[in-house]
Amino acid sequence: MKKSLIALTLAALPVAAMADVTLYGTIKTGVETSRSVEHNGGQVVSVETGTGIVDLGSKIGFKGQEDLGNGLKAIWQVEQKASIAGTDSGWGNRQSFIGLKGGFGKLRVGRLNSVLKDTGDINPWDSKSDYLGVNKIAEPEARLISVRYDSPEFAGLSGSVQYALNDNVGRHNSESYHAGFNYKNGGFFVQYGGAYKRHQDVDDVKIEKYQIHRLVSGYDNDALYASVAVQQQDAKLVEDNSHNSQTEVAATLAYRFGNVTPRVSYAHGFKGSVDDAKRDNTYDQVVVGAEYDFSKRTSALVSAGWLQEGKGENKFVATAGGVGLRHKF
């Protein structure tokens, strides 16, 4: 019996040496409640309330690499949503890819985070409700079926370029070009992400040319995180010669005290949108909350949010609160 076990172990050693596969994931759920009031002409025209048990973005994934020699490695990842509320389906519906990595950097093909999405730490909240995260400025972020190259880091500076065909769904179903850079020096950092698209449809509005730019700067170490972001979108409509633009700003501050990390975010949108430069869609949003770490993998979450769109007699005001639990593996 012992000889059989030894033989089996020895036979498995070459497989273990060649394979480097990691199973990972996050399970997170909570209870959220919200109330929204819409005003038109100074009158309340609708009131909506709701409370529910929600999934906060659970996921499961597999990733690995193979050493091809001479410093070159094959890399791959398959990641999918894993809602404990049973509302997500499909396979590889999060970031999933295959590629090569070496001294030249990293080249990947698949369903990949856009360069803009990789600057998304400005919105660190685990939430389902749009009122419990600075989600309006984060709305253009996406995962795209694309090819992407990430350079190695030189003196704290690295860059990325990405190309997507019109193989994506919804508002991202258009040919697009993406670029960005990251600079780190100690705890200080600067990030830029941008994209250019042609012939895009957003909410049934036909756009001939569209571009977006986001610049994020801040400081991040083991205890303190602080960042400020500015984002501008610009669009030329098919049936309109004018360029419509929208500018948004956001800031996030967090500090870790032992096992507790309180956090606050603020976002503001200025007048104007990509479909109408004169549209008054000004908004203000505040989210406050905290995390308590029971361990390195398990944390309790609590947050509260407030959002106001418009002002005066015509406005939309929403408040929300949530508690949750998150476990990483």
Curated annotation (Swiss-Prot):
CDD domains: gram_neg_porins. GO terms for biological process: monoatomic ion transmembrane transport. Keywords: Cell outer membrane, Ion transport, Membrane, Porin, Signal, Transmembrane, Transmembrane beta strand, Transport. The keyword Nucleus does not apply. It is found in: Cell outer membrane. One of its GO terms (cellular component) is pore complex. The keyword Transport applies. GO terms for molecular function: porin activity. SUPFAM superfamilies: Porins. It is a multi-pass membrane protein. Residues 1-19 form the signal peptide. It holds the Pfam family Porin_1. NCBIfam families: porin_porB_Neis (NF040479). Belongs to the Gram-negative porin family. Homotrimer. Serves as a slightly cation selective porin. This is Major outer membrane protein P.IB. It comes from Neisseria meningitidis serogroup A / serotype 4A (strain DSM 15465 / Z2491).
